[in-house]
Amino acid sequence: MAVTARNQRVAEEMKKEIARIIRDEVKDPRLEAGLVSVTGVELSNDRHYAKVYVSIYGDEEARNQAMEGLARATSFIRREIGQRLSLRYTPEITFKLDVSIEHGDHINRLLARVRAGEYADE
């Protein structure tokens, strides 16, 4: 799937706007339990579908609650995106949990343990 320059620009604008909407306008207490960061947006070639990757700081319960809150707010967020960005078609939004930051942190901790001489398997 080739990513066009237009899709990249639209995805970046969507990322910024969705982050603003979640931070400033969505009033769901489930989203306040964990810190939600939008890490990326992946658009389909026809720009009808968008996968929004989010990183949620907190324990497993906070992540689950935040994902439920995002699922409930999806139609509101989509409507706001449609009003703020001049797109022919407002993409259907799907939120996906991005665990790459946590995975990278785990790798860094393991490397630090190896450097410190702790060779225990994990």
Swiss-Prot record:
GO BP, one annotated term: maturation of SSU-rRNA
UniProt superkingdom: Bacteria
Keyword Cytoplasm: yes
Protein's cellular compartments: Cytoplasm
GO CC terms: cytosol
GO molecular-function term, one example from the UniProt record: ribosomal small subunit binding
Assigned keywords, A-Z: Cytoplasm, Ribosome biogenesis
Pfam families: RBFA (PF02033)
Gene3D superfamilies: 3.30.300.20
Family indicated by similarity: Belongs to the RbfA family.
Function of the molecule: One of several proteins that assist in the late maturation steps of the functional core of the 30S ribosomal subunit. Associates with free 30S ribosomal subunits (but not with 30S subunits that are part of 70S ribosomes or polysomes). Required for efficient processing of 16S rRNA. May interact with the 5'-terminal helix region of 16S rRNA.
Assembly description: Monomer. Binds 30S ribosomal subunits, but not 50S ribosomal subunits or 70S ribosomes.
UniProt protein name: Ribosome-binding factor A
Annotated organism of origin: Moorella thermoacetica (strain ATCC 39073 / JCM 9320)
Lineage, highest ranks first: Bacteria, Bacillati, Bacillota, Clostridia, Moorellales
Gene name of this polypeptide: rbfA
